[in-house]
Amino acid sequence: MVLAAAMSQDAEPSGPEQPDRDARSVPGAPAPPAPPGPRGMQPPPPPPPPPPPPPQAGLPQIIQNAAKLLDKTPFSVSNPNPLLPSPASLQLAQLQAQLTLHRLKLAQTAVTNNTAAATVLNQVLSKVAMSQPLFNQLRHPSMISAPHGHTGVPPHATTVPSTRFPSNAITFSAGQTRGPGPSVNLPSQPPNTMVMHPFSGVMPQTPAQPAVILGIGKTGPAPAAAGFYEYGKATSGQAYGSETDSQPSFLPASASTSGSVTYEGHYSHSGQDSQAAFPKDFYGPTSQGSQVAGTFAADTAGGLKGEVGPLLQGPNSQWESPHGFSGQSKPDLTAAPNLWPPHPSQPYELYDPEEPTPDRTPPSLGGRLNHSKQGFSGARRRAKEEQAVLSMRPLQVQELNDFHGVAPLHLPHICSICDKKVFDLKDWELHVKGKLHAQKCLLFSENTGVRCVLGPAEGTLCASPNSTAVYNPAGNEDYASNLGTSYAALPARTFTQSNPAFPSASPGMNFVQRKLGAGRVVHICNLPEGSCTENDVINLGLPFGKVTNYILMKSTNQAFLEMAYTEAAQAMVQYYQEKSAMINGEKLLIRMSKRYKELQLKKPGKTVAAIIQDIHSQRERDMFREADRYGPERPRSRSPVSRSLSPRSHTPSFTSCSSSHSPPGPSRADWGNGRDSWEHSPYARREEERGPAPWRENGEDKRDRTDMWAHDRKHYPRQVDKTELDERLEGGRGYREKHPRSGSPSSLHSVSGYKSREDGYYRKEPKGKSDKYLKQQQEAPGRSRRKDEARLRDGRHPYPDDSGKEDGLEAKGTKSKQSEKNRTKRPDRDQEGADDRKESRMAESEAGKEEQDSMEESPSSVGRQEKETESSDAENTRTRKEQDSESGSEAEGESWYPTNMEELVTVDEVGEEEDFIMEPDIPELEEIVPIDQKDKICPEICPCVTTTLELDLAQDFTKEGVKTIGNGATEISLKSPKEPPSASTSCPSDMDVEMPGLNLDAERKPAECETGLSLEGSGCYEQQAKGAESSDVCLAPMLEQMSSPKPAEERAWQPGPFLDDGKVGGTPEDGAAEGRPLEEKASTPTETDLQSQACQGVSTQENSGYVEMKSLDARSPEYTEVELKQPLSLPSWEPEDVFSELSIPLGVEFVVPRTGFYCKLCGLFYTSEEMAKMSHCRSAVHYRNLQKYLSQLAEEGLKETEGAGSPRPEDSGIVPHFERKKL
């Protein structure tokens, strides 16, 4: 860019002025007065001549190296000629360029294959580059070479160029004596940047050195060259070296017209700033050939990005001398017929700038875009060479190198153009020569306005023969190749189109036109091969407005979309720049088309209208399908969750709603929709149709799907109706599949059955959900409340979730929901719950084991267990889901929430989008995921306990009169106490199963400590701790949930006692303890959740559930004691051995934040929560104290169990007692 700028400066003034500029630019170049002849130019820059001799000296090799670059000599020559106003100069430059081209061709292999020669050339070029920025522009090696040649002799120039711009060198050398002047100017201007600019990223080097380095890089030796020559590198000084020169070739053309180019560049500079002015001024005043050269120079030197384009553009806007320019160019072309194509290339560049240069700018978007947009003419670029370089900077050296296929210095290398990782040079070569890279380069140059890239392409185009070779050599230059073919051929064609579009015959006209008027054509690249349809492409644009036309080029994996308005096209491009568009999982490169302002081409295949109609009809079909699937969900998508899902699916594309939904449908959209739509019937029905068998019969499949869904569900149900969602997802899925909805007369599969159940859910959810949410809201801000709620749900569900978690969502939801539902909502459900509980226990035993196995895969185990429990807990699921509605989707919260507690909260607030994150939402509360896991653990631990304890709790709750949603579960627990033997018997099995679960829990607890915290802490612990430590429990669960580590530990530890309790016969007590927490939770249907959310629920729970907790705790201690006593039998195994062995933080809830973090059990203060909960709660001292505490609670619980209803007051006493003991 700097070179371009220097060139522009040189060119801007007239021949005479240019010398001044040259002098100015290059200290060593005292007023190279744009001599009439190329050589005249050569002499003008005194500094350049010295460098040329060195190049000559070292140029034997360099010349050979530059031989390749000579391929572009025509450009160089032509460009120099344009720089030189006189036709004679142009002819001379052409001749020189041809000679140099031949020489360079001879020497090309030498430099390309000879590192030493490349180095020498680099050195020479660096020296020359300093004096002749043009050469830098020309592409460090070539440019510098060219300047040398120009400065010195055309052969020398050629020789120097041979590094990179053989032709360019020749062009400069022969093209124009003036060339050196501009070259000098450029160097003095430190056009390194400019050089880079022309070459996109190479310019960063010092004015001269960078060019040289770049040149070498192109050759392969120069590091800078690598950046600039990335593409050149690909050509490796082959034809592409020339190709690199292709840009440099342009620059060579520029070099050739160095003086002119510089002049023009300068003009371009100012002119381009005022685009018309420069082109007019320069083009008009300067010989057109010169102007052309200038343009090329601007293009090449100006970064070949927008400079030439801008120059042309400027001229284009006032293409006054487009023909003249063309003519002038033609002399250049005379040297190389392709030179004219370069002119089209220039127009192409113009097009480039016009086409959102930013498109090209991705790598060098800034510079390109800025420049294209700034001046869209090399002039401006040059005028702001530095700036251009900077803007070009966006076009990193690496991007340039990648663009040009320069072999990476380090492997593995990620192609900055294609974002593809290449592990070895062979792969790199293949990649560079591949379609993807070519297309990306094309897109890159197009979108980035990479004149550099385009320049090379243009240069290639210009020196079609050389350029083509260059392009091919550049293999990497697939882009160039494409450009060459599409742009070389197309430039003429495209430009031709442009020409028609523009009055001027110059192909650049098109660009000018494009530039002049913002286009409404969007260029889409990197379409997935063979899997992209017109619909996919059009779908990308539909969200932004009407698509009026399109072109889908499957062979090149490109497409053009014509929007009705430029604003729509710009909005589309801007949007997809921020969020990559995806088709079939492949990222698309979407940029404003620089080639087309509108698509007047015949539409291939179907008409846009037909396709859009197809898309709309397809969307309707998809919507209907979704309606079937998630039909009600769709409307429900008005809910944040649905919105989340919808936007999420819409995110990729407007029409991808359905498609997005469809693909995720089974895993995300389906469950999301299912939970989204209150009408599960369509969703359930669809789900059943889709995978009833797999989900029902195949635990794994179900788990797989359920895993995703579980996460989503967890969040979503939370927002929607966890019960409903649970029902939908679990029940809908597994329960529905396994059991017709118990609640619904028809089978789950039947829509009516589904709806019946859903209706129940709707009815219930309002209750449970309302209660849950009301309580949650009362207790805490919605978000933390929901999180805590989820936690508490998990905690509450831990009992039910012992089996329920094993069941995934089913057992837990079934139990807690059943219990709560039975209690608060349906007495008959209590029976159902009991049956379900029995089923749950059995299923939980199985699921407990399964869950233990898959506990870590909480979603998986959820799915699997869900399946199991769904079969055995069909009613449980239904009841649980109903209860979930009542309890605010406890089960869902539990099983889903744990996975993504944060998500759930976010989902509640934000919508279903969070559902996606459901699993990832561990950050908000580590407890969240742990909750899920521990919930599973808890379910394993508490299946019996939950059932028996729930029965006990139900009794206790009945005594206590705490009958809420949790009451269903509590009542079940109450029943348990009545059947302590059976409960114990049942529990022992369950407990055995669950004890392993606990072990697994313990094992998982380290990872799931927080989970255990929320689950066990909220559930088991809360039950136990609530029994023993109602206030502590409330606070602890809050704190625990807030700080998951310790509560997790304690909860994890307590689950063991629960299990033990359940086993021993304290199951009723445990159940009572659980039931009480459930009661409390039940009191506030969400209280269970709230307790899980102890943090949130603490206020309310502490208030309403707190008292209850204390009474519960009164009982809970007994239960806990029973549990502890049993744990005392088993405790050594579970709490002590298991936890010690597993080093799981237990009793985390006992760590409460005070001055520091204080462990109430051990009376120890810690400054860090992590230290207290993670380290201390894993310590033997804490384990022992916790065991003692639990044993005490168990003893007290036994006593209290007898008077389970009254102990609540005692609970407070017990907790304080415990606290005292702790203290």
From Swiss-Prot:
Q: Which SMART domains match?
A: RRM, ZnF_U1
Q: Where are the zinc fingers (Matrin-type)?
A: 1157-1188
Q: Where is this region: RS?
A: 630-657
Per the database record, which ranges form the RRM domain?
A: 520-595
Instruction: Name the residue ranges with Basic and acidic residues bias.
Output: 626-636, 676-711, 718-737, 755-774, 786-852, 864-884
Q: Where does it live in the cell?
A: Nucleus; Cytoplasm, Cytoplasmic ribonucleoprotein granule
> GO terms for biological process?
heart formation; mRNA processing; regulation of mRNA splicing, via spliceosome; regulation of RNA splicing; RNA splicing
Modifications made to the protein after synthesis: Phosphorylation regulates the subcellular localization. Phosphorylation of Ser-637 and Ser-639 in the RS (arginine/serine-rich) region promotes nuclear localization of the protein. In contrast, phosphorylation of the C-terminal disordered region promotes localization to cytoplasmic ribonucleoprotein granules.
Give the protein's biological function. Answer: RNA-binding protein that acts as a regulator of mRNA splicing of a subset of genes encoding key structural proteins involved in cardiac development, such as TTN (Titin), CACNA1C, CAMK2D or PDLIM5/ENH. Acts as a repressor of mRNA splicing: specifically binds the 5'UCUU-3' motif that is predominantly found within intronic sequences of pre-mRNAs, leading to the exclusion of specific exons in target transcripts. RBM20-mediated exon skipping is hormone-dependent and is essential for TTN isoform transition in both cardiac and skeletal muscles.
Q: What is this protein called?
A: RNA-binding protein 20
List the gene name.
Answer: RBM20
